[in-house]
Amino acid sequence: MADIFDRLFSLQGKTALITGAAGGIGRVLAVALAEAGATVGLHDLTLAQLTESIRLVEAAGGRAVPLTANLGEVAACRQLIADAHAALGRLDILVNCAATNRRKPIDAVTAADFELISAVNLRSIYFLCQAAHPVMQAQGGGKMINISSINSFFGLGSVSVYGLTKGAVTQLTRVMAVEWAKDNIQVNAIAPGFMATPLSQPVWADPYKAEWLRSRIPQRRPGQPDELVGALLLLASTASTYMTGQTVVVDGGFLAGGSWVEDQ
């Protein structure tokens, strides 16, 4: 049994770069990549933010390569790929996990809000992948994994900019998959549901919102970041060599539908 799992899911000898590696989801995914055998480039805004992620990757027996960049700047995105390639020697896997949000109704969103969320959540992914493409092309292939959101698939108040950026990431994933399939590069996305992370903490801390969500999630609870690891390892490994342009939804059944109140 171990042989088939190793053959399909092992990342031994692979290198990966994950952005937003200090965040709630990014840190867990970074450790999972290391546990699967990859050398992991850990990105965030500052080295201080990465201290705990580095410790956890090394505790898992992995090698961590810390990298910093302000993903709000296109030049910094391109430089991050160059730095990662130089430090890692090659780039087999790119995981775009960095994200930000400001919860406001549309009427309260400022141009600065729009620019920040769009730059981090969408523009950075576009130019990180653009810069990574020739690197992966030259080495014979690779894996790009974009962290999208179930907000790609339904409307929710007060997250208009976040939702549109994640919807765009889902579509961008398809287009990149089509353009780069000839280079043996698989581009896929993961769309988490309502997860228990620092970014979503204000939602779960609100009793009304928390109860509203639980009543609509068939599994009746928030997801945990480590429940995204299975999807990550599928998309990062040889188990998904004929899978590209897809968005894997991990949402406790939220998008599948709900129950009548009396059935809950």
Regions found by a protein language model. Name each.
Residues 88, 126, 141, 222-250, ...:
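C-terminal substrate-recognition "lid" of short-chain dehydrogenase/reductases
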Residues 149:
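Residue(s) in the substrate-gating loop at a strand-loop-helix junction
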Residues 134, 178-182, 241:
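Alpha-helical segment proximal to the catalytic Tyr-Lys
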Residues 105-106, 113-115, 213:
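Substrate-binding pocket helix/loop in short-chain dehydrogenase/reductase
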Residues 10-41:
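Canonical Rossmann dinucleotide-binding motif of NAD(H)/NADP(H)-dependent dehydrogenases/reductases
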